[in-house]
Amino acid sequence: MGQQPAKSMDVRRIEGGELLLNQLAGRMIPKGTVTWSGKFPTIDHLLDHVQTMEEVNTMQQQGAWPAGAGRRLGLTNPTPHETPQPQWTPEEDQKAREAFRRYQEERPPETTTIAPTSPTPWKLQPGDDPLLENKSLLETHPLYQNPEPAVPVIKTPPLKKKKMPGTFGGILAGLIGLLVSFFLLIKILEILRRLDWWWISLSSPKGKMQCAFQDTGAQISPHYVGSCPWGCPGFLWTYLRLFIIFLLILLVAAGLLYLTDNMSIILGKLQWESVSALFSSISSLLPSDQKSLVALIFGLLLIWMTSSSATQTLVTLTQLATLSALFYKN
């Protein structure tokens, strides 16, 4: 009892090889704390590993592995048979080269490739399909003669355009015309008054510049000649003098134009070219929006009403240039 059958020599050799590999593997795998930080092996572990690997390589080179013991290290065939390498003699190598050269020379030439032709467009004829044999039916069908478009076209009556911009432009042009007429009338009267005052100052001494009609009994405050208010008898005489001065200016201008007809044409052309260039440069700086133009004109008018005489002259010239450029632009 308790006796076991005797193990054969092969079994003992396998068990001995496994014990040897277990001992070698134990020396290869470090145990315990590796270092103080637990990351790197010590020098003793490295030396044990190097010594064990040298012993394993020596045993593998000598073929001393026992049968079946190689599976512990993943070696399925510890002593593989070497594959015999072919040995070529110089004569055999020369013969192989000559045979390959003759093959290249006797090889048939490559055939030239033909470019692929584009496929002919396929078109269905009435005789190709029995459903389309009766061509007259297709030609006489109303849908064949007048095919409907893929997208239906809906015809709508044209909408009448609203004339709001034209109405606004007409009102704006009327306001601008009234404004220009007002400014021109004021400036013409101012120029005529200055000429009248200069005429009176030449014909009357400086001490007698008071109006002679203010002592006729009317309750009028003292004033100078040429500045007669409404109600003074000299008011009509003042505007009569202004009218006479205006007629004289027109007569002088007409005489100059009549005497220098050709010169006036040349001067007119030169002046018109310079004025057109000035107006074109000013119109390029004007805003295109009509509301902005109205705001600009009324802003200049406000400055003109609340400023001195010198500023009024400059603003008036600016307004006239702006309005003229606006008409030139339109």
UniProtKB/Swiss-Prot annotation:
GO biological process entries: membrane fusion involved in viral entry into host cell; symbiont entry into host cell; virion attachment to host cell
Bias (Basic and acidic residues): 92-109
Region (Disordered): 68-125
Region of interest (Pre-S), residue spans: 2-163
Transmembrane segments: 166-186, 239-259, 293-313
Biased composition (Polar residues): 76-88
InterPro entries, sorted: HBV_HBSAG
Localization per record: Virion membrane
Designated gene of the protein: S
Positions of the record's site feature: Cleavage: 240-241
Function as written in the Swiss-Prot or TrEMBL entry: The large envelope protein exists in two topological conformations, one which is termed 'external' or Le-HBsAg and the other 'internal' or Li-HBsAg. In its external conformation the protein attaches the virus to cell receptors and thereby initiating infection. This interaction determines the species specificity and liver tropism. The large envelope protein probably also assumes fusion between virion and host membranes. In its internal conformation the protein plays a role in virion morphogenesis and mediates the contact with the nucleocapsid like a matrix protein. Truncated S protein may be involved in translocation of pre-S domain through the virion membrane.
Recorded domain comment: The large envelope protein is synthesized with the pre-S region at the cytosolic side of the endoplasmic reticulum and, hence will be within the virion after budding. Therefore the pre-S region is not N-glycosylated. Later a post-translational translocation of N-terminal pre-S and TM1 domains occur in about 50% of proteins at the virion surface. These molecules change their topology by an unknown mechanism, resulting in exposure of pre-S region at virion surface.
GO terms for cellular component: membrane; viral envelope; virion membrane
Post-translational note: Myristoylation contributes importantly to DHBV infectivity. It is most likely required for an early step of the life cycle involving the entry or uncoating of virus particles. Phosphorylated on pre-S domain for about 50% of L proteins, the L chains with internal pre-S region (Li-HBsAg).
Keywords of this entry: Fusion of virus membrane with host membrane, Glycoprotein, Host-virus interaction, Lipoprotein, Membrane, Myristate, Phosphoprotein, Transmembrane, Transmembrane helix, Viral attachment to host cell, Viral envelope protein, Viral penetration into host cytoplasm, Virion, Virus entry into host cell
Glycosylation sites: 262
Protein's recorded name: Large envelope protein
Lipidation (N-myristoyl glycine): 2
